[in-house]
């Protein structure tokens, strides 16, 4: 690309190739913000891909929104692989990032490598995400050395909810904010291509974003991060309860209830199927 040719926009850009981690880095240099959504199945992944969402996260939040658990802890690597494969098969442009679930990397670098390799070989992921700062640096370095792109995740780390004492905002005190910044810088030095900041004060999200050269992705981290992510069911108004940081852009729960009710009423009344929906 010549110096006179503008870089393609990250959101809604060309569908001729996959978004890469280099594209995300270039977007930060340009000051271009971008969206990320979760996806767990082929149909929604295809819709989001067609909508121009540049990064899709196959999140361990599947534990709650797909499998019905009350935390992310129970979901397994064997659960995550087919979900990742479905999203990868259904998309042409979005960078597909898969969460390393609880228990799949904490034992050390070797376990992390084995788990990430499965998500990439069997699931088709182009990158993986893991939670934690200083305590997972060895895992991050091993993954990056093996050629596996890694997205970091600090702040509220749901896999550690039992240690954190619940789903609470992190980094409110000066000491806690400094610890988060230290973790973020360590992750950057270890080679992550981006860092998720979850449930931290807006000022902390802004400062970490300012000090890192890699993109930050906010979820409840204020307006100044380089990107924003939401669980798609929260974004679309399907979840029954959402956090303060969630904005719902549709009321999918009500639409689905209305559709199911209309279908049921027509079946009971004998008006579906009608001639239009029957074979001659």
From Swiss-Prot:
It comes from the Bacteria. It is found in: Cytoplasm. Its EC number is 2.1.2.11. It catalyses: 3-methyl-2-oxobutanoate + (6R)-5,10-methylene-5,6,7,8-tetrahydrofolate + H2O = 2-dehydropantoate + (6S)-5,6,7,8-tetrahydrofolate. Disulfide bonds: none annotated. Binds 1 Mg(2+) ion per subunit. SUPFAM superfamilies: Phosphoenolpyruvate/pyruvate domain. Homodecamer; pentamer of dimers. GO terms for molecular function: 3-methyl-2-oxobutanoate hydroxymethyltransferase activity; magnesium ion binding. Pathway: Cofactor biosynthesis; (R)-pantothenate biosynthesis; (R)-pantoate from 3-methyl-2-oxobutanoate: step 1/2. Mg(2+) binds at residues 60, 99, 131. It comes from Thermobifida fusca (strain YX). Catalyzes the reversible reaction in which hydroxymethyl group from 5,10-methylenetetrahydrofolate is transferred onto alpha-ketoisovalerate to form ketopantoate. GO terms for cellular component: cytoplasm. Pfam families: Pantoate_transf. This is 3-methyl-2-oxobutanoate hydroxymethyltransferase. Its cofactor is Mg(2+). The active site is at residue 198. One of its GO terms (biological process) is pantothenate biosynthetic process. Belongs to the PanB family. Signal peptide: none annotated. 3-methyl-2-oxobutanoate binds at residues 60-61, 99, 129. Keywords: Cytoplasm, Magnesium, Metal-binding, Pantothenate biosynthesis, Transferase.
């Amino acid at each position: 690309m010549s110096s006179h040719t503008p870089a393609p926009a990250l959101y809604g850009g060309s569908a001729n190739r996959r978004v890469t981690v280099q594209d995300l880095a270039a977007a930060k240099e340009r000051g271009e913000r971008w969206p990320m959504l979760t996806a767990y199945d082929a149909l929604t992944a295809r819709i989001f891909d067609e909508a121009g969402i540049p990064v899709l996260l196959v999140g361990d939040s599947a534990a709650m929104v797909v499998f019905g658990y009350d935390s992310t802890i129970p979901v397994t690597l064997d659960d995550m692989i087919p979900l990742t494969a479905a999203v990868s098969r259904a998309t042409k442009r979005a960078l597909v990032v898969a969460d390393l679930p609880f228990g799949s990397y904490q034992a050390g670098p070797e376990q992390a490598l084995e788990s990430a390799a499965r998500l990439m070989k069997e699931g088709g992921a182009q990158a993986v995400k893991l939670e934690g700062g200083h305590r997972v640096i060895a895992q991050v370095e091993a993954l990056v050395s093996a050629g596996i792109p890694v997205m970091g995740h600090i702040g509220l780390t749901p896999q550690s909810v039992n240690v954190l004492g619940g789903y609470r905002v992190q980094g409110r005190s000066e000491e806690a904010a400094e610890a988060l910044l230290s973790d973020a810088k360590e992750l950057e030095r270890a080679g992550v291509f981006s860092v998720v900041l979850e449930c931290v004060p807006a000022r902390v999200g802004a400062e970490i974003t300012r000090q890192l050269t890699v993109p930050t992705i906010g979820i409840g981290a204020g307006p100044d991060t380089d990107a924003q992510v939401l669980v798609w069911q929260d974004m679309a108004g399907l979840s029954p309860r959402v956090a303060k940081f969630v904005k719902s852009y549709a009321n999918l729960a009500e639409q689905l209830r209305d559709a199911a009710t209309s279908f049921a009423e027509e079946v009971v009344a004998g008006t579906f199927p009608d001639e239009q929906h029957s074979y001659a």
